[in-house]
A protein has these predicted regions:
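Short aromatic-enriched loop/helix-cap "lid" or pocket-rim segments at secondary-structure transitions
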Residues: 50-52, 182, 203
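SIR2/sirtuin-family catalytic core signature
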Residues: 5, 12-13, 22, 26-48, ...
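Active-site periphery "cap/insert" segments of enzyme catalytic domains
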Residues: 56, 61-193, 198, 254-256, ...
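Short, charged, surface-exposed secondary-structure boundary motifs
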Residues: 196-206
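N-terminal ordered "arm"
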Residues: 36-69
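Acidic, metal/cofactor-coordinating or nucleic-acid-engaging core segments within structured domains
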Residues: 213-257
């Protein structure tokens, strides 16, 4: 993310102090000019001819991991846009997962009972939920890293002017701004990660689960069913996008927005799943406007 990049750019005084020094120098260099913040979404890359739609990712998964593709099709009711996928991760049909796995829930008094039956049901539920969380994210990261930014050079859809003397808040994982418009890394906040750096890329929903989805917790519940619900709960935790924590981690960047005069949105739908970021941006800028 942002301070991750600054570690490579700044020496001495600590990363945060170094970034604050850099900001002061940056603001002095553009004194008298309008200070803009560009919010960049996937539509920006799409306009440059890059295959970054959700349907392109699904095609990649269909080719490289058919089992995962089938699970996505069955349990995640997403449309064609990224914000729909992220929202759908929080609307996974977990009841269908439990229902489809019931063939492994063998009754205890069956004649051919095996000790393996103690674990088969919850194992199947856990396998599906892990596939739709960890494995999906692994395939996603591999796909993003394989996107060829050079394809954007051939695009007739450049968006002039993209001034370098601005700050950029990007939801994209690609380096289109850097490679096509020569915007320095230090002026770009890749809020969900950058595919060029060895870090986790963030993909998730905004549905915070406050308590277990298990409706019948108690000593009389079949332990296999209880453990299956544990896997469901873990899924929602593992696919949750911790926007609040990310904002705290990147507080230096958000504090820097106090000098912004204008916000320009390019290629983002302002979807609810990213609402916390927009609220924080608005709050950071509003502090100045309110005096």
């Amino acid at each position: 993310m942002f301070l991750h990049l600054m570690k490579a750019l700044l020496k001495g005084g600590g990363v945060v102090n170094g970034y604050q020094v850099w900001l002061e120098s940056f603001y002095n260099s553009i004194k008298g000019k309008a200070m803009r913040l560009y919010i960049i979404g996937n539509g920006f890359d799409i306009r440059h001819g890059l295959p970054t739609r959700y349907k392109h990712f699904k095609s990649y998964v269909a080719k490289n991991d058919k089992e995962l593709y089938d699970a996505i099709e069955e349990y995640i009711p997403a449309g064609d846009e990224w914000n729909e996928l992220e929202s759908a991760l929080g609307e996974i049909d977990y009841e269908l997962i439990l229902q489809n796995s019931e063939m492994f829930l063998v009754t205890y008094n069956t004649e051919d009972w095996s000790d393996a039956y103690h674990h088969d049901y919850q194992y199947e539920v856990d396998k599906i939920t892990r596939m739709l969380s960890a494995r999906l994210k692994e395939q996603f990261a591999d796909w993003v890293k394989g996107i060829n930014i050079a394809d954007a050079y051939n695009s007739e859809q450049y968006i002039p002017p993209i001034p370098r003397e601005s700050l950029y808040f990007s939801f994209n994982y690609t380096n289109t701004l850097q490679q096509i418009y020569a915007v320095p890394d230090a002026q770009i906040m890749h809020i969900h990660g950058n595919c060029s750096y060895d870090e986790d890329l963030i993909l998730g929903h905004s549905f915070r689960v406050e308590k277990s989805l298990n409706p019948y917790i108690g000593p009389d519940q079949d332990i296999r069913i209880a453990e299956a619900y544990d896997s469901i709960d873990k899924y929602f935790g593992n696919t949750f996008k911790p926007s609040e924590d990310i904002i705290k981690e990147e507080n230096v960047f958000f504090s820097s927005l106090k000098n912004v005069d204008e916000v320009i949105v390019l290629g983002h739908s302002l979807a609810e799943v990213d609402g916390e970021y927009f609220s924080e941006i608005n709050k950071s800028i509003q502090k100045v406007l309110d005096g």
